[in-house]
Amino acid sequence: VGSENAKVGETWWFALPVPTNTSAEPIEITGVSLVQVPKGIEVLRYGAYSLEDTEGLALLAKEGDDWTPRFAALRDHSGEPLKVAPHASSDIYYLAQLKITSLPSRSARYCEFDYRQSGRAYTQTLDCEVELTGK
């Protein structure tokens, strides 16, 4: 996913993969991050929002656009572990708030999820990618 119209100074929201638990035991997600962030992109923060509140998955959205959810007015669930039931997908998903500080030369890639299951801590890295380029 990406945009060829990014400009220095803009802020974008990029959705990480929707948390899905394929195991038979519940999990609690305790943290998320983008692993490879190129020069030119600064991660301001990570938020966790309801699919219902954002009226679906806001895969990539420029802050301030008419169609972009008003994240500041929505409940951010990132302050607490996110519980995902066995064999289920979450109705809460994570987004990275990204600031363009200079035009990036490459994509931001790989999403890391920290979680607990049955008293043990795990980290899982999933493939995800956002490319923000401009002229």
Where are the predicted features?
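Non-catalytic macromolecular-recognition regions in eukaryotic signaling proteins
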Residues: 1-135
